Amino acid sequence: MTVWITTAQASGLTLLDKRRRLEEQETKAQLIRSGLTSNEARIRIIRMRPEHWPALEDIVASSLRRRLADEDLARDWDPLTPDELDRLMLSGRWPGPNNGLRLAQRNYAFPVDLVRQLRTTAWRMSERALTELHERRLVGSGKKLTEEQRRVRDELALQLYPPARIVRQALTEYPPALPE
């Protein structure tokens, strides 16, 4: 799944990933010093990895699951209809105001159930504002909007909860960390 996170979040995740790799290398060296062969140490590291050094996407997924469990997002949502699923498959970003955030694109292979939960939550939280944006014809590429139309579009866009916004909130409210 492709998401847009802040450049600060992207930098933090890059540092976390670097720390994870360094800890793995240090542990491998310690295991070799303790008498294991290089291959034995590598096998031990591979077995330790899920618990001690999970993949970055697993760490981000953990933060995301916590955010989706928060009271404001955790609801018994109706499943997405085939038409809604089709609309979610269309490429492009959700409309949003130009708030000056510097964003970085990241791709994560989240579990299918988490992607479905994220997309359903995003759609259900946003459907009223999305409907109004489309009814007023305030979205679409190449639109020439008046100042008033831009103002209305930006107001409605603030009510949207696109998947990337939820991921950014997850990373802010539940900062990723390696297991202790």
PLM regions with names:
Residues M1-P50, P82-R150, D154-Y161:
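Short Lys/Arg-rich basic patches
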Residues A69-R75:
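Arg/Lys-rich amphipathic alpha helix in sigma70-family domain 2
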